[in-house]
Amino acid sequence: MINLEQFISQYVTERDSSLFAKDIQNNSVALTKAIKDKSMLVIGGAGSIGSSFIKACLQFHPKALVVVDVNENGLAELTRDLRSTKGMYVPDDYVPYPINYAQPVFEKMFRARGGFDIVANFSAHKHVRSEKDIYSVYCSCVYS
């Protein structure tokens, strides 16, 4: 079976560690104080940026992690990834919700949980304008 992390390091990024590794290490005391035993809500957590944020934060042991995303398959992938990664800390209170944060059920969940210590919002449109229509970006950047 292929080791995905090793493959990415060797063939994609061509580096052994994250560009943020040194900063995270240098600020580990402050990050631990800010995250350890805190409740976290990550909106848009199934996407690439949100899931990377979650993985970076989990090493500092939050007491609760609630992930909200409209992409139910992405939430399932994130959950499998977190639970199958050797050495990955996942709090007992880990709940993925496939909901839109603009729906009334989001507010109901938020109030029922009594709020959160940390809220991070990485929700975004699936495709940005430049991916769909490169010429619109060209026109607005060159002719504006």
Regions found by a protein language model. Give the residues of each.
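N-terminal Rossmann NAD(P)H-binding glycine-rich loop of SDR-like oxidoreductase domains
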Residues: 39-60
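Short, conserved active-site loop motifs that form the nucleotide-linked donor/cofactor pocket
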Residues: 94
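NAD(P)H-binding glycine-rich loop region in Rossmannoid oxidoreductase-like domains
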Residues: 56-67, 83, 89-90, 99-138
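Non-catalytic terminal and boundary segments that flank Rossmann-like NAD(P)-dependent oxidoreductase
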Residues: 1-39
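Helix N-cap at the beta1-alpha1 junction of Rossmann-like dinucleotide-binding domains, i.e.
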Residues: 69-74
